[in-house]
Amino acid sequence: MSKPTAFPLDESKLPFEIPKDAVLREKIVKLGQMITDRIPAKNRPLTAEDPEYWGLASIVTDEMADVALKMKVRKPMTLPEIVKATGKTAEELEPLLYKMSCVGLLEYNWENPRREKQYVLPMFVPGSAEFFNMNKQQIAEHPEVTAFFERMTFLPLEHITAMVPPGGAGIGMHVIPVEKAIETENQSLDIEHISHWLKKYEGKYAAGPCSCRMSRAAMGEGCGDDPDDWCIGVGDMADYLVETHKGHYITYDEVMQILQKAEDNGFVHQITNIDGENKIFAICNCNVNVCNALRTSQLFNTPNMSRSAYVAKVEKENCVACGRCVEYCPAGAVKLGQKLCTKSGPIVYPRQELPDATKWGPEKWAIDYRDKNRINCYDTGTAPCKTACPAHIAVQGYLKMAAQGRYRDALALIKKENPFPAVCGRICNRRCEDACTRGTIDQAVAIDAAKKFIAQQDLNAESRYVPPVVQPSLQGLWKQKIAIIGGGPAGLSCAYFLALQGYKPTVFEKNPHPGGMLRYGIPSFKLEKDVIDAEIEILKELGVEIRCGVEVGKEVTLADLRADGYKAFYLAIGCQGGRKAGVPGEEAAGIQTAVNLLRTVGDDENYKMSGRTVVIGGGNVAIDAARVSLRCGADAVTMVCLEPRDGMPASAEEIAEAEEEGTAIRCGYGPKEFVTENGHVTAVVLKKCTGLYNPEGRFAPTYDENDTITLPCDNVVLSIGQCIEWGDLLDGEAVELGRGQGAVADPVTYQTAQPDVFVGGDVYTGPRFAIDAIAAGKQGAVSIHRFVQPNTSMTIGRNRREFFELDKGNLSIGEYDHTPRQQAAVDEHIDAHRSFRDAHLTLTETQVRAETARCLGCGASVVDPNKCIGCGVCTTKCEFDAIHLHRDLPQCSKMVKSEDKFKAILPYMAKREIKIRFAKKGK
């Protein structure tokens, strides 16, 4: 039996069965034992359960094994030498050697003075295990090679990674930094620069598929990347890849394009590290979620297996906690923390324990490193604004850019999370401001007003910002068709983020125009239609197709769309229906829901009302209905709500504006019945509300039925909730409905019981705000991308977007700008009380500079140097010159040949053992 491992394969998930009872092929046993680096497997006969056996047995014939057994690992042999060793003729050998090379059991080069072709039996990793996995058809026919590759990057290492010194001891791969990140480093070595290796192998480059991406996907743990062309063979390896149908030649310019696209995606550059400092044969662009090489440092928590000579450091004074470095750091070395000191001084952040002076075993590993490395924030918290925003926009970052006059950069930063900043600058409920630390001193920073100013650029075609498409593919835009049902903020947001990933989604909207509740549920005096249209135009420029006047479930079904080639669906139709009160008389003429009123007026601002109007409800929608009623001609408007004045759901600002316009508000009552005459409402009888919630905290109002008042009226507008109107959309689908007829879905992926159907926005959460829908749309796009890419995990390495607010009660706030909060002016040419035009102006540029200076700069990124692998990806994402690489670990650039690995390991191991003993004595 094979030696037990601390991290066994989950055989239930393998795309094949391990042939444990197979009759052993002796030549394969010998070959596996000869090549493996796994010490236990060298000291005993292989069994059918050993990956060295079943991996080779699946693809290597006995004839191939015969030849390979006459060779030695990594010892080149020319054809004449192989002829002599095997006794076969050259005519017999050449086609066999070619086949062995195409399969991946052999490689070849011309690295000798005569430039004579010589064949090499490579080690498993890096070597034949990768080569086996560079051909899709071969993987399909021999899926065993995928798990073989995975095992050979784990089993030989699980007992030695803690003993590997800086530089990697000639094992596997080695991180090489982003070139731009070390251009100004005077002490850098040539071998630390990608440009050095490209010059060394000038004119000899080939691009091939990534074996990690291919094999992991075949095992059901794909990352959603297109695997083709991310790995670059250099020198003679380029010829080998091309001649054995694993790659194609590329030019220097194409190499640079691949490297740039890799950096755009946050992939890590790595070079082979088994031939010393004078040779590499590949430059890989690695995704940590699938890379078997990066796993050697991340899973075992042994960074020496990967790290370069560089460590990232944050310049705290420049950092604004935008979180871009955090999102892309492959090692989870950067997290958001705080810049402001606590009352007892700066926070001292924990560091990852290292194996240098500690016994190291499975209890020190991070089996779930792909998820742990996506933790965004230290438990002690970070900037409250970023935490409170449902979309977690980099508020502190765009305020700093605005303060510097970098308005376009600020807009670009916002649009990494929010495609509708101009819309949100007018109607957001501003949870960021509610959480703002400045509000504990005087007044919160006017974040939304600053965003509105920044986003004005989007309203002009000449100045609008259209983000670049960044997709994890080098093969052009994705071909998969995706349908989004519903053109509101969730659906449009999903479409936007899919477009940024290289898709061309189609939005189906039943109304004449897109926008959903933004257009049909928010009056123009708060959000003008041209603002909505301007930002939707940007989606169209990105390639989003919007088909209006199409009700899915009626004109066309989901089944029809599937038949038309659509691979995934995002249902985001919102809560477009209004709820009734369930009291006598509510079917009378003159009674309508707020949703209906707002939709009617959204279509026709000349809609007329007259007489006395009562609006039932206390939220922002009720406020909108009241204000719209006055603009439509109502003589008087009274709002009635269950809540006390200080408990009304509507914002204080909205309440104040409504009252200023003439709306009367009566709190603490609910409808008992509607009085009618000749089928028309004439009055509403109200009953006193005595309580809102039951002992479990659920909304369950109680009343005193004897304490009533009667309000005469000619119109009633019900704003007591919204409902989902599914129509025939779900007919024949497996989508399940839960409370309030909302769709039941996975809380992380938003995937329903119908696997290709995802949901988002109000149909999942119930009625919420636009920014909630926007955040949900982005997560929907993440899920759909993972779903439509073959064999991709829906959750592994997924950013869960969890943030924590710093303790505002434990801050030592020093000097700060004492400027008061700025207020935007009102256009005096507009009748702000009765016009449907938006009278609110934006802040002036002078005001924006003054307002952004009020930001206290609460948050900052924090690097754990014990986790940093020195890739430099973080530096490519920072737009504040706040994070740089420093050459703190020059010993990590020591490259040795694989054959000399123990010459490097043994001295380090001895020193480590002494440290461990001293550490024990110290305890």
What are the functions of these language-model segments?
Residues 72, 76, 83-85, 103-112, ...:
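Iron-sulfur cluster-binding cysteine motifs and their immediate structural context
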Residues 88, 119, 270-283, 299-328, ...:
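Ferredoxin-like iron-sulfur electron-transfer modules
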Residues 115-154:
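Short, amphipathic alpha-helical interaction segments positioned at domain boundaries
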Residues 331-384, 445-481, 500, 504, ...:
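Flanking helices and flexible, charged tails adjoining ferredoxin-like Fe-S electron-transfer domains
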Residues 393-396, 402-403, 444-448, 484-552, ...:
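Beta1-alpha1 glycine-rich phosphate/pyrophosphate-binding loop at the start
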Residues 454-475, 534-554, 578-632, 737-753:
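Glycine-rich dinucleotide-binding loop and its adjacent helix/turn
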Residues 587-610, 694-767:
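FAD-site-proximal beta/loop scaffold in flavoenzymes
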Residues 763-788:
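A conserved FAD-binding loop/helix module that cradles the flavin
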